[in-house]
């Protein structure tokens, strides 16, 4: 079986640049996921983020999660749970405006560390978007500019912990879905696994690696690339032992950004005969639809947006 794509970003600076770019392109076309090493974020920064995130969970969130589990009677379930996930989360919004000062449970050291980490992730996300542009034959910054609404992009981090689960066969850590947004950068636990992606009808483990960043593509990049790159179904399997940490940072279009296939990637004949596979829409409209259909296939969402495009009153 094919190996999960691992990209060494340092190789972009030397004789292996062409081969590395080809590897990124293949990962985007055939996996929708890849894992970065030597990505430029210092290991000591990642170690500090991990230490403080795990400490925050133990101090502020672990007991709340135990109380929620007890309240819902989840430890004694006998049938599959399909309406919730075995995860404890909070969300840090970075752009267009930050909420990090408003979250009550974070101490000042954690806030400052996460502000620094966010800047590094934002820079990396934009560098990756430019690499995708290069592979796609689009002008530099095309994707970044497409993501810019009137207030810039949306960027935020979902901080998740997946505690030990007594019934991992009946409760998912996170149910299968594709991500709605643009490009997602994941800093995950290297000791407790659980993330899987769907490839060729099989669930494949995303290997946990120390100090790596896992990258996956969201629905918006599938639309903009006219299907050349794909968003892929993925899930988190709950584990009986160990608490898994996950920080998923979503670099998404701004709410009023207009999303549609890049003209350079659209077949002219299909365009002339109005046989477009992908719709044109405002990102916020897609997110409103996604909120109710997250754990379903993406194709009906695209079709619903096409219907809205042709008859907005019918969907309103």
UniProtKB/Swiss-Prot annotation:
Whichever gene encodes this chain, its name is: ACO2
Reactions it catalyzes: 1-aminocyclopropane-1-carboxylate + L-ascorbate + O2 = ethene + L-dehydroascorbate + hydrogen cyanide + CO2 + 2 H2O
List required co-factors.
Fe cation
The answer to keyword Lipoprotein applying to this record is no
InterPro entries registered for this protein in UniProt: DIOX_N, IPNS-like_FE2OG_OXY, IPNS-like_sf, Oxoglu/Fe-dep_dioxygenase_dom, Plant_2OG-oxidoreductases
Q: Which UniProt keywords apply?
A: Ethylene biosynthesis, Fruit ripening, Iron, Metal-binding, Oxidoreductase, Vitamin C
Biochemical pathway: Alkene biosynthesis; ethylene biosynthesis via S-adenosyl-L-methionine; ethylene from S-adenosyl-L-methionine: step 2/2
Which tissues carry this protein? Leaves.
- Residue ranges of the Fe2OG dioxygenase domain? 153-253
- Family, per the entry? Belongs to the iron/ascorbate-dependent oxidoreductase family.
Induction record = By wounding.
Its name, as the record gives it, is: 1-aminocyclopropane-1-carboxylate oxidase 2
Which amino acid positions bind Fe cation, per UniProt? 177, 179, 234
Q: Answer whether the UniProt record assigns the keyword Transmembrane to this protein.
A: no
């Amino acid at each position: 079986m094919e190996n999960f794509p691992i990209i060494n970003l340092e190789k972009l600076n030397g004789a292996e640049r062409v081969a590395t770019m080809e590897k990124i392109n293949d990962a985007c076309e055939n996996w929708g996921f890849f894992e970065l090493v030597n990505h430029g974020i210092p290991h000591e920064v990642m170690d500090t983020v991990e230490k403080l995130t795990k400490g925050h969970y133990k101090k502020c969130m672990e007991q709340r999660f135990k109380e929620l589990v007890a309240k819902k009677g989840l430890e004694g379930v006998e049938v599959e749970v399909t309406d919730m996930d075995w995860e404890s989360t909070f969300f840090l919004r970075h752009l267009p405006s930050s909420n990090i000062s408003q979250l009550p449970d974070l101490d000042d050291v954690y806030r400052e560390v996460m502000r620094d980490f966010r800047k590094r992730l934002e820079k990396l996300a934009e560098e990756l978007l430019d690499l995708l542009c290069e592979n796609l034959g689009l002008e530099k910054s095309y994707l970044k500019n497409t993501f810019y609404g009137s207030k810039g992009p949306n960027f935020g981090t979902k901080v998740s912990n997946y505690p030990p689960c007594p019934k991992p066969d009946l409760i998912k850590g996170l149910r299968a879905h594709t991500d709605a947004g643009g490009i997602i950068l994941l800093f995950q636990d290297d000791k407790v696994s659980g993330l899987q992606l769907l490839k060729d009808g099989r669930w494949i483990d995303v290997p946990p690696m120390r100090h790596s960043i896992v990258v996956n593509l969201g629905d918006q990049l599938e639309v903009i690339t006219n299907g050349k790159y794909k968003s892929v179904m993925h899930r988190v399997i709950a584990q009986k032992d160990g608490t898994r940490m996950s920080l998923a940072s979503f670099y998404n279009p701004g709410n009023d950004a207009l999303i549609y296939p890049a003209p350079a990637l659209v077949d002219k004949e299909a365009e002339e005969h109005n046989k477009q596979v992908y719709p044109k829409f405002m990102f916020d409209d897609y997110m409103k639809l996604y909120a109710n259909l997250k754990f379903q296939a993406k194709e009906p969402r695209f079709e619903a947006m096409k219907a809205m495009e042709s008859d907005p009153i019918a969907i309103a």
